[in-house]
Amino acid sequence: MESLKELYKIGTGPSSSHTMGPKKAAEAFVKRASDADRYKVTLYGSLAATGKGHMTDVAILSVLEPVAPTEIVWRPDISLPFHPNGMRFEAFKAEKPVDEWVIYSVGGGALANEETAKNPPANIYPMTHISEILEWCNREGQTFWEYVEECEGPGIWDYLDEIWTAMCETIVRGLTAEGVLPGGLKVSRKASTYLVKAESYTDSLRSRAKLYAYALATAEENASGGTVVTAPTCGSSAVMPAVLYHLVNTRNFSRLRILRALATGGLFGNVAKTNSSISGAEVGCQGEVGVACAMAAAAACQLFGGTPSQIEYAAEMGLEHHLGLTCDPVCGLVQIPCIERNAIAAARAFDAN
């Protein structure tokens, strides 16, 4: 398995596969064809079907247009064989083709194609199944975050510290922002309202309403194209931060314990990414919000003092009750049902404990 640095990434919403990935691809292509006087980008399959709502064209044009005029072609009727999120970049000079590149956005902001599949990145983790890792934990008398440190080295904590800071900053921004989200559905931001209303509720309702507010804050920031952390994706980026932020504010957990919880949750997300997929276009929302709920449930269970077996069971419950969940955004926007789905999944992560 790859490093958690390839799972948790700071980027802009609303979609890691439809925004972050295509922008990253455009940046790579412009480096290899910087002297072109015209670009053409053809989007296939899911990228073309929902790309307008996900601002795929905006992400690509923000990179290529300053260099040369760029044409975007939408082909939702064609799916390339490697992955539903296919892109073809073409560069022209004096109307003659000078470069062509086919690449796929495979989820979580990652890129791949047939060539990269032949030369996969170096594995950081020798074990790729939770059953194997759980056996290691029981044998060594250690837990999941210690396995992460064993494989990644102590430098992972500085990276996770940056990730946690970014998550908190997103929530704070989202809690103070108001107005209507872009895209035409006229969805109003609700996070700040939920937070205010929470103070008038009794204890249990107040706690649940605040959790919803924290999740809505990140999900709404993502929907507006703001800065978020993939956990494991942009579309599911609100679940893990909401759960951990809520626990910090209600239980006063130390920053170190939160970072360890991030490591544990990330490990479960990494296993799902490695053995299946976290791409909504490929496996539906069960691979995004479902995996995010599993990650958050595992992180919360660890903070509550759970054993490795209990942590694994919490993650299992977080995922299994999202199985079959489709990726079905209204008008292709990461808003309905995506925003509220993050909030409900955050609550389910607690229910799993």
Named regions from a protein language model:
Residues 192, 344-346:
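C-terminal auxiliary extensions adjacent to catalytic cores
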Residues 168-284:
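Accessory "access/gating" subregions that flank catalytic or transport cores
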Residues 8-26, 225-243, 285-293:
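Conserved phosphate/anionic-ligand binding catalytic regions in large, soluble enzymes, centered on
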Residues 4-12, 23-45, 53-54, 68, ...:
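Non-transmembrane, aqueous-exposed alpha-helical and coiled segments at domain scale
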Residues 264, 272-342:
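Hydrophobic alpha-helical bundle architecture
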Residues 19-32, 241-252, 297-305:
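Alpha-helical support elements that line or immediately flank enzyme active sites
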Residues 70-201, 209-210:
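C-terminal regulatory domains involved in ligand/effector binding and gene-expression control
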Residues 59-74:
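A glycine-rich helix N-cap at a beta->alpha junction
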